[in-house]
Amino acid sequence: MINNGKALNNKKSIDYSKLFRHQAKFVAGAIHINQIPDFSLPEIVFVGKSNVGKSSIINTICNNKSLAKVSNTPGRTRQINFFNIVDKLIIVDLPGYGFANVPISVKEQWEGLITYYLRNSHNLMLVNLLIDSRRGIKENDKKVAELLLANKREFQIIFTKSDKVTDRENLNYEAQNFLATLNYLCNVIYVSSRNKEGMRELKASFAQCIKHQR
């Protein structure tokens, strides 16, 4: 497990598996690196390609349907969004990557913001690399995984929109090969915001990760 080298708020033992019974609230947004806040709380991060379903998953996990804005238009999330769960845990929603229909300068700004945060956050405990189960693992996903490993960030693969895929054998094989090339072992979880598949496992993985790292 990774120790990011900063003491976090740990006045008493917290049962993180029960935190998600509480609604989260939006507390900050960052468009530039100098706007990134430091809450000195554990951070669980969601990153993935544009329109992968990040907002829907975050809303489902955080028990708040209107928390993160859901859109069918790729590139809707244009800043890093921070959501606070009863001053015990921060959920972080990063802008989607790989969206081409924006000016190059804007795309470079998003990528720079994402990269800076992933490299420099002292409170980051776990990164959820979200991948559309209908599309499989793409080159952009591989680059993000390599960035995470280069910066010693713990991550797990989350296949989203699992209700739309019936045959998972090829996906499992693809994920295993992908992780083997990285020489990395992690959770692979299928989730759906529609039928709630995988939500319990996802929350449990957060609690387990934080427990081991603190």
Swiss-Prot record:
Disulfide bonding pattern of the chain: none
Protein name: Probable GTP-binding protein EngB
Pfam family, one: MMR_HSR1
Species, as recorded: Rickettsia prowazekii (strain Madrid E)
Family (UniProt): Belongs to the TRAFAC class TrmE-Era-EngA-EngB-Septin-like GTPase superfamily. EngB GTPase family.
UniProt cofactor(s): Mg(2+)
Residues reported in the UniProt entry to bind GTP: 48-55, 75-79, 93-96, 160-163, 191-193
GO biological process, one term: division septum assembly
Entry-linked SUPFAM superfamilies: P-loop containing nucleoside triphosphate hydrolases (SSF52540)
Key word GTP-binding present: yes
GO molecular function, one term: metal ion binding
Chain sites annotated for binding Mg(2+): 55, 77
Family annotation (InterPro entries): G_ENGB_dom, GTP-bd, GTP-bd_ribosome_bio_YsxC, P-loop_NTPase
